[in-house]
Amino acid sequence: MSRRYFGTDGVRGRANATLTADLALRVGMAAGLIFQRGEYRHRVVIGKDTRLSGYMIENALVAGFTSVGMDVLLLGPVPTPAVGMLTRSMRADLGVMISASHNPFDDNGIKLFGPDGFKLSDEVEREIEELIDEDIAKRLAKPAEIGRAKRLEGVHARYIEYAKRTLPRDQTFDGIRVVVDCANGAGYKVAPEALWELGADVVSIGVEPDGMNINRDVGSTSPAALSAKVREVRADIGIALDGDADRVIIVDEKGHVVDGDQLMAVVAESFKEDGRLARSGLVATVMSNLGLERHLAGEGISLARTAVGDRYVLERMRADGYNVGGEQSGHIILSDYSTTGDGLVAALQVLAVVARRGKPVSEVCHRFDPLPQILKNVRYASGRPLEDEKVKIVIADAERRLANHGRLLIRPSGTEPVIRVMGEGDDRDLVENVVDDVIDVLQKVAA
């Protein structure tokens, strides 16, 4: 059954257009009613990134939750994984993160976490959807039972200490020069501070949010600024987070980007060496490079694949007992520590491997040669371009041409009106030609 409000990562849309204060109010009321079960006082924690619209959505959510009798703890700008962690730590019934992750500032979103700190299941989200469009006014709290809202103090210190505890107590990064790019987003305070407390020589960029510059030419989706700064200050490593700090990419001392596939290999091999890699394998999506799978097989590590989306990676990890998973885009999930992707924690694990090896990042983190992979996007205004007959024909022809030489993956984004076309194979020219042929037809149909 199609869903009206929830996508693959919560409720998301353009601020004050599809994601309005009224919708946020109703999400708060509906979610509050679903999680208000029992006679005790109910509690929700709300965090956000640095988008201008976060103020509007935060206040609307507070009104929604308190109107149905839930108390609210406001965290302010914090990484998404901090919300999962604090939902559990504060024994809250529900956690909320206001963010559109790596999207531009004029988008925003509402991610919901259960009392266990994990994102809600599809089933619970469907329950909330059904309530959003109902007449909830009949179920509002009595005047004496309206909830209260307050700001929680010391949030950043709590999260920093949590992140540091994922390392051995004697682990330091003395003598390592780190450039950290916080995307002008949720990690702009905690990431530089955590690295400094661990002894690193820290140079920070993307730490001056103004409400509209989140992810703009900085962060994990725009690594050029980080690469340039690493070379400029002769740093040992660069770390780039995205807007809500749940994903990370690394830049080596030469300014070369290390993506999530390479980072998963680094962490999985380190965990295996220490005897703590569950099931001797990891979970990644269909987007991860075939080179990763081949490399891991040579290291005695299996790779299980899922649909695209960190929630599906995590579901597979929880169902089958894996403790390492992630996406090529930099969502790295280490379930021994976190209930979601955590850019800072993943970066600390990689830094620990670098410190232990005592070698340049270019040697430590480039674990395999990826197969040529071409990824292109087509934006569309409406309709279902993939159901067009001309598109079906060109896709079938592309799959035939790549049959014995690689693979083709075409999928609509779960968070925006975009179709992603990915081709991969041993012959780069063939892959590029195949992808371009599909893109040409899609663009004509989508126009």
UniProtKB/Swiss-Prot annotation:
Gene3D superfamilies per record: Alpha-D-Glucose-1,6-Bisphosphate, subunit A, domain 3 (3.40.120.10), Alpha-D-phosphohexomutase, C-terminal domain (3.30.310.50)
Keyword Transmembrane helix found: no
Positions that bind Mg(2+): 101, 242, 244, 246
Classification via CDD domains: GlmM
Keyword terms of this UniProt record: Isomerase, Magnesium, Metal-binding, Phosphoprotein
GO biological process: carbohydrate metabolic process; peptidoglycan biosynthetic process; UDP-N-acetylglucosamine biosynthetic process
PTM annotation, UniProt: Activated by phosphorylation.
Residues that bear Phosphoserine: 101
Reactions accelerated catalytically: alpha-D-glucosamine 1-phosphate = D-glucosamine 6-phosphate
GO cellular component annotations of the record: cytosol
Cofactor: Mg(2+)
MF GO annotations: magnesium ion binding; phosphoglucosamine mutase activity; phosphomannomutase activity
Positions of the catalytic residues: 101 (phosphoserine intermediate)
EC number: 5.4.2.10
Presence of the UniProt keyword Metal-binding in the record: yes
Manner of cofactor binding, per the entry note: Binds 1 Mg(2+) ion per subunit.
Family label: Belongs to the phosphohexose mutase family.
HAMAP family in UniProt: GlmM_B
Function of the protein: Catalyzes the conversion of glucosamine-6-phosphate to glucosamine-1-phosphate.
Official protein name in the record: Phosphoglucosamine mutase
Organism for this UniProt entry: Xanthobacter autotrophicus (strain ATCC BAA-1158 / Py2)
Lineage: Bacteria, Pseudomonadati, Pseudomonadota, Alphaproteobacteria, Hyphomicrobiales
